[in-house]
A protein has these predicted regions:
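Helical segment within the ABC ATPase nucleotide-binding domain
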Residues: 171-183
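ABC ATPase "signature
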Residues: 216-217
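Catalytic Walker B motif of ABC-type/P-loop ATPase nucleotide-binding domains
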Residues: 156-160
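Conserved ABC ATPase signature
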Residues: 131-135
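Conserved ABC ATPase "signature" region
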Residues: 100, 104-127
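Conserved catalytic motifs of ABC-family nucleotide-binding domains
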Residues: 152
């Protein structure tokens, strides 16, 4: 049994002369909720795209659930999924039709039961007969999450999971994701620049800047390490080039 859901070694991704991901290595423990935290251009989405096999690394290795994805990518597909509010769902299909399409891709045995269960737990049952193109941004975010959970994934990738949601709904979604990870023993890797979300949701954080991991740790550990009161203050310190050792010296 492998200890880590994700194992990354010496990962590099270049786009022409631009180094989007600069020689990073990290592991994500099974059953954890781990965040990639960084501003725009930090490399979060590029990293997740490589982990999912959507982008080929310039160099380095990636193992997902014990499998080297360069050699065995397709064997992991039934066990993983992805959600992002920035990925469009077919507007001409109803929510139910969209979920049916994705359920069939994963060969779900009891599609009707799975859709019913997800729609109830994510509060989208009243949206099932509506066309996706007629939904609000927040409603689309919840539907995208239902799509990502259709196969009960053991590894879930999330890109800004609560974008476009009002504060109450966003907080509810975070609680839902925590319960999902706990109940299913699933691993979640999320990319975010929402400091409060990372602080409340994550067990562990990798802080990114210009394609590099500049610090890592549990949110409470990082807050204590930097002598700050929350992750937003920690993030600002890192963004401004200050490190924990600098603050101890000052």
């Amino acid at each position: 049994m492998h200890k880590f859901a994700i194992e990354v070694s010496s990962l590099i991704k270049n786009f022409g002369r631009t180094k989007a991901v600069d020689n990073i290595s990290f592991n994500v423990e099974l059953g954890s909720i781990t965040a990639l935290l960084g501003g725009n251009g930090a490399g979060k989405t590029t990293i997740i795209s490589m982990l999912m096999g959507l982008l080929v690394p310039t160099s380095g290795s990636i193992r997902i659930l014990g499998n080297d994805i360069a050699k065995n990518r397709y064997s992991i597909l039934p066990q993983v999924n992805f959600s992002s509010p920035y990925v469009d769902l077919p507007n001409r299909l109803t929510v139910e039709e969209n979920l049916n399409v994705y359920a069939n891709l994963y060969s779900i045995e009891d599609v009707k039961s799975q859709i019913c269960s997800l729609s109830e737990s994510l509060n989208i049952k009243n949206l099932l007969k509506r066309k996706t193109g007629h939904l609000s941004a927040g409603q689309k975010t919840r539907v995208a999450l239902a799509k990502a959970l259709i196969n009960d994934p053991q590894l879930l990738f999330l890109d800004e999971p609560t974008a476009s949601l009002d504060p109450d709904t966003a907080d509810w979604v975070r609680g839902y994701l925590k319960d999902y990870a706990l109940d299913k023993g699933a691993t979640i890797l999320l990319a975010s620049h929402h400091m409060g979300e990372v602080e409340r949701l994550s067990d562990f954080v990798f802080m990114l800047q210009a394609g590099k991991i500049v610090d890592e740790g549990a949110p409470k550990t990082l807050i204590k390490k930097y002598g700050r009161s929350n992750m937003e203050e920690v993030f600002l310190d890192v963004a401004r080039g200050r490190r924990s050792k600098d603050m101890k010296e000052n």
